[in-house]
Amino acid sequence: GVLWGYIADRYGTRWFGLIAAFAMSGSLFALSQQESILQFYGLYFLFGAFGNAMVTSPLFANVGFWFTHKPGLALGITASGGAVGQAVVPYLCALSLEQYGWQTTYMLSAACYLALALPVALLIRESPGRELARLQPVDEVRTFPLSEREVIMWISVAIIFCCTCMSVPIVHLVPLLTDSGFSLDEATTVLMVLMLSGALGRVLGGRLGDLIGALPSYMVMSAGQTLSVFWFPFLDSTEAIYLVAVVFGFTYSGVMSAILVCTRMMVSAKFGARAMSITSFFGWFGMGAGGFMGGYLFDLTGNYEASFMGAMIVGCVNFAILLLFALRIRRQSRGLDEQAV
C-alpha cells in the first residue's frame, strides 16, 4: 500500500481500479485451483498487494481531494462500502460453501467481483486538485500549523493503538459468544449486525468531521469505541449484546472515516495518497497486534475478560495520544499567531 501511495502521488490513480479488478478476480479464480499452502499464501499476497492495496488508500486520497465541500461525507460514503462488504460477502460465501463447496465459491466470487468492479473501474478519474498539484513545480501553500511529517507521525502512532483496540472484538467476538453458550449462527449474526452498523458509522463519522473538525471527530469516535469494547465479556442478555455491538460497530467504523478525514484535511493534495497509505500501514499493524493480543491474553487467563479489558486500555492510550496531538496543534497555532502579530 505504501508503494502504491507513492506511485499514485507521482502518476495518479486513473488505472488503479482497473488493475485491481483483474488482480483480485484473477487471484480468486486461481485460488479455486490451488493445491498447496504455499499457493494459498502466494495468491492471497497477490490479492492484497495488487488488489486491495490499490483500491483503498490511493483511491481514498483521490475521492477526498475531489471534494472541497463536505469531503468528510464523501470519504465516509466511500468507506461505508467496505463495511457493507464485510457484513454481506462472508454471509453469502458461507451459503455458497454449504451449497457448492469451496472451489465453486472462489470461482463465483471471482466472476461477481469482475462483473461489479470492472465497469466502476472504467469511471475512475483523477481529482483536478491532485492533478494540478502533481504538475506544479512548487509545493502547495498549507494553512495547517504542523508539518506533514509531524502530522503523519502523530496519526500513525495513534492508529496503532486505535486499531489494536478495535480488532479484538472483530477477531474474538464470535468465539467469545460461542464460549458463552450462543450458537454459531447467533454469534455470526451479531458480528454481521456490528458490521452493518459500521456502514452507517463510516458515513456519519465522515460527516461529523465536516461539522466539528477532523480531530475532534476522531476523538469522539475513539471514546465511544473504547467505552463500548469493555462490556462484551460481561453481557449475558441477547438484547444487550446486540445493543453494544451496534454502538461499537458505529463508533469503530466512525474512527476509520475520521482517520481518513484527518489525513485529508492536514496534508496537501500532492502528499495525500502517500499519507493515507503510511497511516493505513500502521493501522494494519495495529489490527494484527490486537488480534494477537486478544488470543494471547485468552490463552494466558482462560477467559476473554482480560482480552477486552486490554482492548479498552490500549483504546485509552490512543485517546491520550490524540489529546496530546490536539494540544500540540493548539500550541503551534498560538505560536504562529503571535509571530504574525
Q: What is each residue range found by the language model?
A:
Residues 7-8, 88-100, 177-178, 208-209, ...:
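Interfacial helix-cap and linker-helix signal at transmembrane-aqueous boundaries
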Residues 22-35, 224-236:
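C-terminal ends and interior cores of transmembrane alpha-helices
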Residues 53-67, 254-267:
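Intracellular juxtamembrane helix-capping segments at the cytosolic ends
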Residues 78-126:
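Helix-loop-helix hairpin linking two adjacent transmembrane segments in secondary transporters
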Residues 86, 266-303, 311:
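A late C-terminal transmembrane helix in Major Facilitator Superfamily
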Residues 150-207:
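Extracytoplasmic gate region of multi-pass secondary transporters
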